[in-house]
Amino acid sequence: MTIESRQKGVAKTARNPVKIAPQSTDQLLRKPSWIRVRSSNSQEFYEVKRILREQKLHTVCEEASCPNIGECFGKGTATFMILGDLCTRRCPFCDVAHGRPRPPDPEEPLHLAQSIAAMKLKYVVITSVDRDDLRDGGAQHFVDCIREVRAHSPQTKIEILVPDFRGRLDIALEKLFACPPDVMNHNLETVPRLYRQCRPGADYTHSLRLLKEFKARFPGIPTKSGLMLGLGETDEEILDVMRDLRKHDVEMLTIGQYLQPSIGHLPVMRYVTPGAFKEFERAAIEMGFSNAACGPMVRSSYHADQQAHEAGIIQR
């Protein structure tokens, strides 16, 4: 595979250990009435896109085909995706392209900081593709971005949504310790039984260790994780994962509905009702999470500023 070759859908997941059975459209579960996506046609939406293209930046909103892009861009917010738009993993739930990425762009931290300053954002989420090709998994680039954003917008709070730094955890954490964020987020995504199918190359206990070790070093910085429902898990398995997160000192939680980006991705096994999401939210608070956002359209960075406000991280 050459640098910049892009694989999506069936081509991306063809080498995964658990294959996705071909589906016709009549085999797909019908979306229920509570799954609604806002249209993308406001002036703010196009202004955000203009700034992103001028600064040659990527967002997970676009690359992962997030259903909330219309609402978030329409409000003038975005979740910035650094380190390129090609991921070294092949997760079959995700619409980000797989490929061999280019080296990190040394100008990206500055472009990111300038964009955030231009958008006058009080709260930003910075995420990345997986970069298994880099010795530190991209951790230094996260640090460079945090420093530039703080230099240009010292009042802006920064949440980072990091990959698992597989095989590079100690190096990555050492880098992050030099310039930590205001919120540390790493998604478990699903239950351990489904990791081989849903997160090939990832390890459940490794992800928990990442969250635990960061929290041990910075007890005053909130840690956060997210889960998707509809991949074949049971309610009790989700509750078990929530308990594991609390055992590893994670304080903030997001749970949302998995939506299949294309027929080349994992199918939706169930649509969870809004009432059931409310029950997970209630259970999360009872377990001791300081904040839990649970709902069909919730994503890890969706309304992250609101969640941070409710957790007392930012003031409005």
UniProtKB/Swiss-Prot annotation:
Protein name (Swiss-Prot/TrEMBL): Lipoyl synthase
Cofactor(s) recorded in Swiss-Prot or TrEMBL: [4Fe-4S] cluster
Pathway membership: Protein modification; protein lipoylation via endogenous pathway; protein N(6)-(lipoyl)lysine from octanoyl-[acyl-carrier-protein]: step 2/2
Domain Radical SAM core span(s) in chain numbering: 73-290
Similarity comment: Belongs to the radical SAM superfamily. Lipoyl synthase family.
Lineage: Bacteria, Pseudomonadati, Pseudomonadota, Betaproteobacteria, Nitrosomonadales
Cross-referenced NCBIfam families: lipA, PRK05481.1, PRK12928.1
Entry GO terms, CC: cytoplasm
Pfam families reported in the protein's UniProt record: LIAS_N, Radical_SAM
Organism of derivation: Nitrosospira multiformis (strain ATCC 25196 / NCIMB 11849 / C 71)
Alphabetical UniProt keywords: 4Fe-4S, Cytoplasm, Iron, Iron-sulfur, Metal-binding, S-adenosyl-L-methionine, Transferase
